């Protein structure tokens, strides 16, 4: 799932490539009379993302302005989902995880048609089907949100994401620069 979060266009490209009736190398020029698949008619691709049930969704948000507290970020997630569901209580019951440190997102249990409404809300970047961290293990990523409250922060909730991030950096040969403070020259 972490790979989808970092590169959501890979998911889109894979779906489009797999469902596209026209190949860039085919002899079909895509004339007016040719049939094309409209985006509203796309079917699910179950083998694309394992562990997806299309009942659990990951809503990725734009980063907040300034430096709000963790509780303010979580409250903004609840308010965003409440716009779609109609009440904050319903939103709190629906949310099962949040992420407030490495990326801004929340996981929620909703029906698929509601995702279209959520996508149109302010500050929502993407709505993606959520999947288990480990196939067969009914555990989703992020910090658990239980009974309307987020559990105290612990780095273990992002261990898989951090490991994937480190693996991706190693594969791509990215060497991260350490920031250094500029030293002031002493005037003599």
From Swiss-Prot:
Q: Name the UniProt key words of this record, in alphabetical order.
A: Mitochondrion, mRNA processing, Transit peptide
Q: Which GO terms describe its cellular component?
A: mitochondrion
Entry's InterPro entries?
Answer: MORF/ORRM1/DAG-like, MORF/ORRM1/DAG-like_MORF
Extract the transit peptide range from the record.
1-20
Location relative to the cell:
Mitochondrion
Stretches for region Disordered: 169-188
- What are the BP-aspect GO terms? cytidine to uridine editing; mitochondrial mRNA modification; mRNA processing
Report biased composition (Basic residues) as residue ranges. 174-188
Pfam families membership = MORF_dom
Q: What does this protein do?
A: Involved in organellar RNA editing. Required for the processing of few RNA editing sites in mitochondria.
Q: How does it assemble?
A: Heterodimers with MORF8/RIP1, MORF5/RIP5 and MORF6/RIP6.
What family does the database annotate? Belongs to the MORF family.
Q: What is this protein called?
A: Multiple organellar RNA editing factor 7, mitochondrial
Task: Please give the organism.
Answer: Arabidopsis thaliana (Mouse-ear cress)
């Amino acid at each position: 799932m972490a790979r989808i979060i970092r590169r959501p266009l890979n998911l889109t490209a894979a779906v489009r490539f797999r469902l596209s009736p026209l190949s860039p190398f085919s002899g079909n020029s895509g004339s007016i009379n040719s049939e094309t698949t409209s985006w509203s008619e796309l079917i699910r691709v179950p083998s694309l993302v394992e562990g997806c049930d299309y009942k659990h969704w990951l809503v990725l948000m734009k980063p907040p302005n300034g430096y709000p507290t963790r509780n303010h970020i979580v409250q903004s997630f609840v308010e965003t989902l409440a716009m779609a569901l109609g009440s904050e209580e319903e939103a709190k019951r629906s949310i099962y995880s949040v992420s407030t440190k490495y990326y801004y997102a929340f996981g929620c249990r909703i029906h698929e048609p509601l995702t279209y409404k959520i996508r149109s809300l302010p500050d929502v970047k993407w709505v993606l089907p959520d999947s288990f961290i480990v196939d067969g293990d009914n555990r989703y990523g992020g910090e658990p949100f239980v009974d309307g409250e987020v559990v105290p922060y612990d780095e273990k909730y992002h261990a898989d994401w951090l490991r994937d991030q480190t693996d991706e950096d190693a594969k791509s040969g990215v060497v991260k620069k350490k920031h250094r403070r500029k030293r002031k020259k002493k005037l003599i």
